[in-house]
Structures are given as structure tokens and as C-alpha cells.
Amino acid sequence: NLEQEINALHCELKEKIYQPAPLKQFIIRDPKTREIHASAFRDRVAYHAIVNVLEPIYEKKFIYDSYASRKEKGTHKSIERYDSFQLRVSKNGQLINKPDTNNNIVGYALKADIRHYFASVDHEVLLSILRRTIKDEHVVWLIKKILDNFETEINGKGMPLGNLTSQFFANVYLNELDYFVKHHLRAKYYLRYVDDFVILHQNKKTVESYHERIICFLKSLNLELHPDKTKIIPLRNGLTFLGYRNFHYHRLLRKSNVRTYKKKILREQELMKKGLLSQEEIMQHLQGWFGYAQWANTYRLRQEIMKKCGLKKPSSLDA
């Protein structure tokens, strides 16, 4: 009985006897291998309730250019914002005229990734950040219960991928970095999506200074930048961000993403020949991928894939 379950959950929370159920672990490969942990349904009800209360409070604190797990934000808004930033990186901050060649494009970007971010979140640091805003210790107790329910090799560290609370707390934690970059470094062209972030500036030495100071600041959060995924890149070379290779006046898909999807299509065609997959199911998969691909210059690529599949052209191909 749903009403009885909700009442029981309410009593457990009120009496501080609530204990989340063990997380269910499973692996996804699409294409990167990730370990996902799913909460029980009744726990998800509690987690949604706490996020529904805290989210409006923290939305007022989050910077504009944080794009993950927020209403009216997301991947595509982030890419659009990046486009506007790179068009404005010039000495006087005005729009750059369309260049004849990429060599005419000025500016640099610090493209950075935080190493093992979700596994590295320090519970005590997170709770101290939350306590600045949350004065109700009952709420803090519940948050601690949620954090402690995720068992890791290092006690007091890490959040599970797949939980709504993890996505929300990930933004709260890195809001510290956002404020440091915007208010201490005074970086004008900065945006973040989860643990990936970009800072643009015309001057390379300024970008190098940002890099060094961010490395020092992240120590206060017990975090570090990923050495292989953090680079300073001339904007004329294009920047790979959120699955796209972004240039000033065009955008491409990452080559690895295209290769992976073409292999997937070949596998699905074999399954269709064996009667294990219908044409309608393949079409659904294609429509989902086209939704991602149409944000880049991929018209010919989408035509090629449709031709290989022997399928009619979908409306999304026209975009």
C-alpha cells in the first residue's frame, strides 16, 4: 500500500531511525565502462524529497554557467554558451569577425577534468559546505545517512553514480570552484558541466596562471585535475568538449564516437537479419543518435548511415 509505505517512511525520518537499503550495483558500457549504483524505490522517494527542498535554495547560489543536472540547462545549452564565449575572446571583448583561416583566430582555452571526481568527494568537506546554508541538523543527519550508505575502499569518500542526490551534491561541492574562478580569478569566460570545465582567454599566460591557481585551490577540496585530460589549447585548433569538436563556425562529432556508433549499427543489422531486432527498434536507436548528431555538421554522415541501413529518411535528418 503506497500510502502506508509513505507514512512509514515519514515516521522513520521523523524518529531518525531511517536506514537506506543497500545499493544495487550494475555495469553499463556505452561506450565507456561505468559502475552504476541504484537505490531502492522508497529511498529514491526520500532523496527526491530532500533535493526538492534544497534545490531552490541552492539555485540562487549556483553560478549561471554551471550546466549539469539543472532545469533549463544541459549539454546543448552548455555547447551554445561555449560557442558564444569563443566568439568573444578578443582583446576588446567584442565579437571576432569571421576569419578567412583558423590561423586568424586568437585565444586559448584551459580544458580541464577532475580526476575520479565522484569517487573523490570528501564527505566531511561536503557536510561543512552544506552546513553554511543548512542550519537544520535533522537534514544534515539525513544527508550523512545517504553519504554513508555508499561503501567504498576509503571511508568518508565517494558518491554513487546514478543517484539524484549525487548529481545535486556534485554541483554543491564544485560550486566552491565556480566561486573561486569567477570571484577570485575573475575569469569572465568560464563554464562547467559536472567535473568538466573550460576557461577561455586571449592571453596564454593568463590561462596558465588560472591553471596553476586552480590546482592549488582544489587541494582544499581534496581534489586534483586529471593530468591526461587537462590541457591548454589554442582556439584555432578546435576544442573537444561534451562529445563534440568545437570550432569557431562549425562543430564536428568526436571521431571515436562516430566509429563506435558505426560498429553498433553493423551489430544491429546482423541482429535484424537473424530476426532478433526489428527495423522499428533500429529506427528508434537511430532517432536517439541523430538527436545528438544533428548538433554538429553531420548531414552527410546521417545520410550515409540511413543509406547503409536501407531506411527512410527521418525528419531529424533535415536539421
Where are these regions (language model features)?
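Generic hydrophobic/packing signal
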Residues: L13, I17, D30-K32, R42, ...
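Short acidic (Asp/Glu) and glycine-rich catalytic loops that position anionic groups and cofactors
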Residues: I27-R29, E59-F62, Y108, T152-E153, ...
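Non-catalytic, polymerase-adjacent accessory regions of viral genome-replication enzymes
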Residues: N1-N7, D318-A319
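Conserved polymerase palm-domain catalytic core
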Residues: E5-A8, E12-K16, P20, D65, ...
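Well-ordered mid-protein domain cores that form the structural environment of catalytic cofactors
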Residues: Y47, V51, E55, E72, ...
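Short, conserved non-catalytic motifs in the polymerase core
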Residues: P20-V45, K61-G74, N149-N171
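Short helix-capping/linker segments at secondary-structure and domain boundaries
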Residues: L54-K61, N297-R300
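Right-hand nucleic-acid polymerase module
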Residues: S39, H48, E208-S209, L225-A319
